[in-house]
Amino acid sequence: MNIHEYQGKEVLRKYGVSVPEGKVAFTAEEAVEKAESLSSSVYVVKAQIHAGGRGKAGGVKIAKTKDEVKEYAEELLGKTLVTHQTGPDGQVIKRLLIEEGCDIKKEYYVGLVLDRATSRIVLMASEEGGTEIEEVAEKTPEKIKKAVIDPAVGLQGYQAREIAFAINIPKELVGKAAKFMLGLYKAFVEKDCSIAEINPLVVTGDGNVMALDAKLNFDSNALYRQKDIMEYRDLDEEDPKEIEASKYDLSYISLDGNIGCMVNGAGLAMSTMDIIKHYGGEPANFLDVGGGATAEKVTEAFKIILSDQNVKGIFVNIFGGIMKCDVIAEGVVEATRQVGLTLPLVVRLEGTNVDLGKKILNESGLNITSAESMADGAQKIVSLV
C-alpha cells in the first residue's frame, strides 16, 4: 500500500527522523491558512499524489509570499499531473503539502529495500541525491553505497556511520546522519514497509540532516496489524478495478494489454502472462482468483476484467487442486451469461474434476474455446484478438 508524502513524514517524525514542518491543505484558502501557521518566509507547495517525478512535472512550487501560496494552490488543485510514474492519464491533485522552505547545502539519497538476492533488508545511499536512483545505478553504480543488515541484530550504528562517511556527509554531521538512518530503519521494520526512500536527504545551512521528501510503501499482507497505517489509505489514488477486486479477495493488477487473464495462483498467473507475451500477445491484467474461488467470485472477476475497455479477449487458465474445475466451469458459464460476453473466451482446465468441468463448458451452448494446455490456450487467444 502506498501513502502520501505528508503521511510518510508523519510516520517518520514519530521515529525521530527530522522532516520540515508542513501541513496538508485541500483548498487554496486552507493552503494560505497553513502557510500562516508556519514560521517561515519561504514556502514549498507540493502536489500530493502516489507517484514520483512531481517536481519535474511542475507539481512542486516555491512561494515567497502568502499570495503566491494561494496562486500556486489554485493552479495545482484539480489539475491532472502527468509524471513518468503516473502513465499518460496522470493523477488528479486533490491535496497539497504546504511546507517550510529550508536552506539546502547538499542533497543525498537514502533508501531501505528488501533484497531478494540476500534475503536481507539493504540500506542504500548515494551522494547523488535529487535524481532518480535507477538513473544513478545505470550510469554511475559506483556512487551507490550499500549495507546488508542482519535481521537478528538490525542496523548497527557503525554501519550507519560507515554509509554516512561513504557518501561524504560532512564529518561534523555524521552522527546526525547515522541517527537519521537508524530511525528510518526502525520505522521500516516496525511498520512493515516494503520500501522507504528519502530522496533527497538534505544537509541544511543550520547544520541539520532532514528528509525533504519521503516515499513509504507498506506490505499489504501485514496491514491487519498496522491499523494506523490503514487509516492513511487514499482510495482516490487507487485503480477502481483493484478496489472492487479487493472486496471479493481477488488479487488484481491492471496492465496495458488487451488480453484479460483469470488464473488461480500467483505463480500460474505470472506464467500465463509470460506465455501470452511469448506468443505475441499483451496481457491486460494480473488476476489471481485464489484457491477457494466460488461461482460468485468468478462472475465478479469477469465483470472486473470487462470493465477495462482495452480488453479484446479473455484467457481463463485454471489448475484445480483445492479448487474444483467443475466449480470454475459453472462460474465461467454463469458469468458469460450474466455479462452477455461477446468477446473471444478461451478456457484451459486441468486438475480436480477436469472432465466434469469440460463437460459443463461443452454443454453450455456458449461460444467458449477449450484449450488442452497453457501453450495451446495462449496461442488460441492471441490468434482470436
From Swiss-Prot:
Its cofactor is Mg(2+). Pathway: Carbohydrate metabolism; tricarboxylic acid cycle; succinate from succinyl-CoA (ligase route): step 1/1. GO terms for cellular component: cytosol; succinate-CoA ligase complex. It is an enzyme of class 6 (ligase). It comes from the Bacteria. InterPro entries: ATP-grasp, ATP-grasp_succ-CoA_synth-type, ATP_grasp_subdomain_1, Succ-CoA_synthase_bsu_CS, SUCC_ACL_C, Succ_CoA_ligase-like_bsu, Succinyl-CoA_synth-like. This is Succinate--CoA ligase [ADP-forming] subunit beta. It comes from Bacillus velezensis (strain DSM 23117 / BGSC 10A6 / LMG 26770 / FZB42).
